[in-house]
Amino acid sequence: MSIKLFLLIFLAVILAIALMAGMMMLRSMFMATRGRKIAAYPDPRKALVVLDIQEGYTGTATRQPVTRPPTSGMLFIVNSLIEKATESGMEVAYIRQVFSNNLFVRLHGGRRQGRVIIDRRIKMINDNDFEKNRTDAFSSRQFEQFLIDKHVNELYLVGVDAAYCIYYTALGALNRGYKVAVIADAVMSRKKMADVLERYKRKGIEVVTSEELLSMV
């Protein structure tokens, strides 16, 4: 076997391995995680989870149309929910997407600080700020442990993208025994929202409006 042929075969094998690794990584990005079931807390609490409303997706630093910039009305609703949740004693947690893989960094606008911080228009009322590198927020062990430490058993999800990160986070929550609801007028997606919300319902994920949530807390 000539050296040239050997090198071609070697490069082909390396390329195949890299391709398989990339496909496996991509597949893992779009899967709900599994974890231990939460305990039956004697003093269960609720949490509002604000997902991926950050400068790289919704603010002035966005470059890729991962989601359409939200209207001021949608941000107003999210901020109103944050205020009400705080007043009622609910926990509020903020989740940010921070990709560690270079390919995903390039595709999603980079890892620069200006792109991964929470959208400046969103009210930050605490330091419950968690990073994830997959669609499911439960891929963050710190976030999962935070909910356990606070005895949370009920989650309300707002943010982007309703078709992916919020959806897989909701499934991750169900896998752990949480009661979970998505706030229909406080989420957004490039996909048709009616279809996205119907997908939630088929999976047993509750869909409520911000008005309904405000009346419950």
Language model feature labels by segment:
Residues 130-131, 204-216:
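Short acidic-hydrophobic, aromatic-tinged amphipathic segments that line or gate anion-handling sites
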Residues 190-203:
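Active-site-proximal loop->helix
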Residues 28-63:
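N-terminal signal-anchor transmembrane helix
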Residues 72-154:
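Active-site alpha/beta core segments
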Residues 156-160, 178-193:
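A short glycine-rich beta-strand->turn/loop micro-motif centered on a GG-aromatic cluster
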Residues 166-176:
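Short Gly/Thr/Asp-enriched flexible loops that form oxyanion-binding sites at enzyme active sites
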Residues 1-28:
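N-terminal signal-anchor transmembrane alpha helix of single-pass membrane proteins
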